[in-house]
Amino acid sequence: ANNNSNNGKKLRETLSETCTRRRAEGRNIVAGINTGFFNSHDGFPRGFHIEYGEPVFINNPTVRQSLSNHRPGFTFFEDRTVSFDNRSFTGYLKVNDTDYEYYSVNDTIVRLNNTDGYDANLYTSRFRKEPHPGIYNPVGSDALFVVGRCSQQMTVNDGWFDATVTAIVDGRNGASVEVPFVSEKTDWVLQVTGEKAAALAAALKVGDAVRINANVSIGSVSKQIIMHNSSMYRFLNGGNWNAVNDATLMPATCIGADQAGTTVKLVCVDGRTSIDTGMN
């Protein structure tokens, strides 16, 4: 396993492999360029990621707020404009007339090995129990798990989605339970702890109708998103070159946007020889 280290190929999917896989899925791919993070050894992307509106990975607020390189991302909106602005996220489960906030999607915070205090977090079919043979995603069981099924796959900035509670698993107070995982794109699991778990346990039963949403703002804009990917750094933003002042000669790629936000620019830098200037 990669163990989240930059230690070579191992289980990571290269960009070429991603293009090959997507073409086999029927995507019309002309070329690919790295914009940020890669799939980790845990089997899900690192950083904020939205794919055809689906919230594939939304990292928890502590990471989003404390790490400046986790704030910006490349966004391609449904109206065919683009942006590199910072992003924010809010998500809610509506039970009757009460909204219960959740804070992340498919984040390792569900392992319950931190003290951040975010008491409700969602995971979907993207979060797999065994993403690769012999590699497992642990989920903390000392929580209430609400399993739901939407009438259609939930996408960001598309309002409320109707859902039905299909299972409730209560692992609180040390109860021995099997943590639920889902395999359908319409399904999700909400892991809840603390007072919010007590409130939901009292309010819900299997078969109940609920509603759920996922809202992403890019800068001051909140509209339908086709793709969003963590860009790590904004080297080319609003038509302005903002590359790091690094004399190290190394290859680099990035994706940028013009000032109007209507043109995408792909940048490839060859820094492998002494005659190259790298990112300078």
Language model segments and positions:
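Gly/Ser/Thr/Pro-rich low-complexity, intrinsically disordered segments
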Residues: A1-N280
